[in-house]
């Protein structure tokens, strides 16, 4: 009974959840700003006048790339792209017109959105400036080099390691050459030794008949002495 009640409760929760309209959260504009409009007219405005959707000029920005405020209150956004290295400049009092002007010194625009951004200050993050930046590209930073003292210590360490490796390699090579020479010399030394052994054995084998002849002559001498 308890299992059926639990299953019924879960089913009711699913039905109630499906009956409610789903809310799609749009990305926020960040702290201190409010998002107004939708689609290509989506704007991010600073909190200037609570309760009012429209914001004064220079306090709103269109979220969609290449779109810009078309009036002082930024009620609508208009499409106006610019080439890389340029920014959009609005003209007019009631309805804005646009033109593209070059980015100021120290700023860049890599795309066609018409907004120039400041170059990255490499020294602020403790880096060196590899490329200072221009109107179409940001500055490129690289880590600072190590101090000269650290370079000196590293150089000494590397030299010592290289000397040790060279010494070990030389010793290993010398041992290898010595083993090869020994292998070539050993067969030549064993052949005379074998001949010496064979000659010694042959000499021993020839001594036995001489000893037998000596014994026979001694016996003959004894026998000869018996005969008158």
Curated annotation (Swiss-Prot):
Residues 20-153 are extracellular. TNFR-Cys repeats lie at residues 28-61, 62-101, 102-142. It comes from Mus musculus. Glycans are attached at residues 36, 40, 121, 134. Disulfide bonds join 29-44, 62-74, 69-82, 103-122, 116-141. It comes from the Eukaryota. Residues 1-19 form the signal peptide. Induction: Up-regulated in peripherical mononuclear cells after antigen stimulation/lymphocyte activation. Receptor for TNFSF18. Seems to be involved in interactions between activated T-lymphocytes and endothelial cells and in the regulation of T-cell receptor-mediated cell death. Mediated NF-kappa-B activation via the TRAF2/NIK pathway. The chain crosses the membrane at residues 154-174. Keywords: Apoptosis, Cell membrane, Disulfide bond, Glycoprotein, Membrane, Receptor, Repeat, Secreted, Signal, Transmembrane, Transmembrane helix. This is Tumor necrosis factor receptor superfamily member 18. GO terms for molecular function: tumor necrosis factor receptor activity. Preferentially expressed in activated T lymphocytes. Residues 175-228 are cytoplasmic. The keyword Ion transport does not apply. One of its GO terms (cellular component) is extracellular region. One of its GO terms (biological process) is apoptotic process.
